[in-house]
Amino acid sequence: MTDQPILMFDSGVGGLTVLREARVLMPDRRFVYVADDAAFPFGAWEEPALRTHILDLFVKLLDRFAPAISVIACNTASTLVIDALRERFPGHPFVGTVPAVKPAAERTRSGLVSVLATPGTVKRQYTRDLISKWAQKCHVRLVGSDRLAGLAEVYMREGFVDEEAVRAEIAPCFMEHEGLRTDIVVLACTHYPFLVNRMRKTAPWPVDWIDPAEAIARRALSLLPPVDGALPQGEPDIAVFTSGKTDFAIGRLMQGFGLSVR
């Protein structure tokens, strides 16, 4: 079915950064955005419980929406459960979100790179394996932030954020060594690009902030079968919140992203 939607999954509103890029690349496609806000933040969960929760949830999501592809627009979930999802649902394509270590290693001039992520992503062996594979010649600092995802949620809902709190969370990313400075910070959580302007403002010096959203969207596009002619016009793009609870601010935010809350 060519009118099958693309499913975007995150713990909250962070995956909207990926949706935004996907819409540019796939303007004729229909999207279903699923925010598992009942389980937010994923980083607070024990790994086995979170893995089971997401696998069980996807049984329901795939049955309800029958998507053409599912994008796990969350680093914490992807590094934990993407392989298990592919094993559990072998006939369905999944696109994961992993820290953009390879492009960071290719771009850095100083060799000092920081990966800004949730504590869950920082502690995963998956993340360390990426560094070992792609950034052996770099000094990579893993920085786990307990607060940034929540600050991004507040910012997107309310339109303001405590800049001093942002400054404190990003401060460990900035290293100086033998006259060299950190020149790349990988945003390894899809929530973080919403705060990148505040990060630039509060950073001690300019760096290149790597947002993987476009690369994720391009990967999803590459896995979709080609379409002959125009796609049929069907249901509108929708947003689903697993808590079943949305307020005016969330409704307005989703509307701004062209999503109807269901």
UniProtKB/Swiss-Prot annotation:
PROSITE patterns: ASP_GLU_RACEMASE_1, ASP_GLU_RACEMASE_2
Pfam families assigned to the protein according to its UniProt record, in alphabetical order: Asp_Glu_race (PF01177)
Catalytic residues of the enzyme: C74, C189
InterPro entries, sorted: Asp/Glu/hydantoin_racemase, Asp/Glu_race, Asp/Glu_racemase_AS_1, Asp/Glu_racemase_AS_2, Glu_race
Positions of substrate binding: D10, S11, F42, G43, N75, T76, T190, H191
EC numbers on record: 5.1.1.3
GO biological process: cell wall organization; peptidoglycan biosynthetic process; regulation of cell shape
Pathway note: Cell wall biogenesis; peptidoglycan biosynthesis
Keywords, in A-Z order: Cell shape, Cell wall biogenesis/degradation, Isomerase, Peptidoglycan synthesis
GO molecular function list: glutamate racemase activity
Catalytic function, reaction form: L-glutamate = D-glutamate
NCBIfam families: glut_race
Family: Belongs to the aspartate/glutamate racemases family.
Record function comment: Provides the (R)-glutamate required for cell wall biosynthesis.
UniProt-recorded name of the protein: Glutamate racemase
Originating organism: Mesorhizobium japonicum (strain LMG 29417 / CECT 9101 / MAFF 303099)
